[in-house]
């Protein structure tokens, strides 16, 4: 509440509840929501399969499996999805490991992809969020997609270095939003991937698996390098001849 007041948001514009989102969910009477933004804790422990009733919870049952007890990330994702309206969209900040790990997390990714809920995965630069230097991802879920593609955006190079952390400037955000809205492929930045490709890749949703990183290595001109080597070798040969001549001259004086 204090944070809301500090940002000049009047009390009648928000409703904050205290509790465990996963085991004591609030706002069930108010759902569904058209827009959800969430930054849940990364890879925290939760009761998971130790509570046999959770697998029948309407939020988790459709996936057929619960998020691992040691990593609740996908439990928060499924919670948000359940609260989303048929025309809604959710943006969830996630730990990057959930996009490629196997086991239950892979099965949940399969559920999300097979049901066409995954609109976009955005990888961000490290050290953007307070309290962590992790390069996190944003998972965008939608229940009103017009195709079955999954968009991947590599925004890991979009940041401005500040004293203690990195920041996204307005220009960076605008660039990401333009690519997100257009769904166009941009070299080294964004790619829309067919459903079949994601399936063939074992439902891996890691951005680096689909967006080729820019090669920052120096381009070497082999012909130019070879010419320089020949010139250097020629200079060395001439230097050896000069040294031999000097040595011979010195030895002649000694005689």
For every predicted segment, state its role.
Residues 1-29:
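S-adenosyl-L-methionine
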Residues 21-24, 28-255:
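A conserved structural/catalytic subdomain of Rossmann-like adenosyl-cofactor enzymes
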